[in-house]
A protein has these predicted regions:
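Membrane-proximal helix-turn-helix segments that form the acceptor-binding/catalytic region
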Residues: 2-21, 135
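Conserved donor-binding/catalytic core segment of Leloir-type glycosyltransferases
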Residues: 22, 64-87, 93-96, 108-109
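Acidic donor-binding loop of glycosyltransferase active sites
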Residues: 19, 161-174
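Short alpha-helical donor nucleotide-sugar binding micro-motif in glycosyltransferases
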Residues: 150, 158-163
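Acidic anion/phosphate-binding donor-loop and adjacent secondary structure
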Residues: 47-67, 158
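Carbohydrate-associated surface elements
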Residues: 27, 46
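Nucleotide-sugar-dependent
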Residues: 83, 169-180
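Nucleotide-activated donor-binding/catalytic signature segment of Leloir-type glycosyltransferases, i.e.
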Residues: 112-116, 120-154
Length: 180
């Protein structure tokens, strides 16, 4: 408890010294101390809807081991900056065996690094990808599950444009920058 208070002290001091605060969501504003609400404006980060828009001719090949993908293919996407429990990676991986069994034509593309952004690495594995593959990997057809690491923003947009289903899991938090 004292350690957490110390970690938050600089934020509270900064809030107290501020004339105005900006946050992208009401949820995030509501996590601030009540006394900070009157000086807090909620302004969403915004999305460039000219650039982030459907493209019926979108296609993508991210690496030689996966098939070329295009609009109309049964593509399921999961994107995080880093693959970790705070962003639902463990839930997604545990759901994959049943999902792939129910959808025999589906290709799954998983985007994200192998470090952590919000939590800790697992104790018995080098990263959460390795931990979850140890748990469910034998139940997966890995020729249909593609871990592509971090990708360029242009590739990310194409991936979302061809995605039939984009899975976004997170604990109550803010909308992930990897989704914007």
């Amino acid at each position: 408890d004292q350690r957490l208070r110390m970690k938050n002290a600089h934020l509270l001091l900064s809030f107290n010294a501020a004339d105005a605060l900006v946050t992208p969501t009401y949820f995030q504003r509501d996590t601030l101390p009540i006394w900070a609400h009157p000086i807090t404006e909620v302004i969403h980060d915004g999305i460039d809807t000219q650039r982030v828009a459907p493209n019926p001719t979108a296609n993508l090949t991210l690496n030689p081991s996966m098939p070329p993908l295009q609009v109309g293919d049964e593509v399921i996407t999961f994107v995080n900056r880093n693959l970790e429990p705070c962003r639902g990676f463990h839930t997604f991986m545990r759901a994959l065996p049943a999902l792939l069994a129910d959808r025999p034509k589906a290709q799954v593309v998983i985007v994200g690094g192998e470090s952590v952004s919000y939590g800790r690495l697992p104790t018995d594995f080098p990263n959460w990808k390795a931990a979850l593959l140890a748990e469910v990997g034998e139940q997966l057809d890995l020729s249909r599950v593609h871990f592509v690491g971090n990708i360029s923003y242009a590739a990310f947009l194409s991936l979302l444009q061809i995605s039939a289903v984009h899975v976004y899991l997170t604990y109550p938090f803010v909308l992930s920058w990897s989704l914007l």
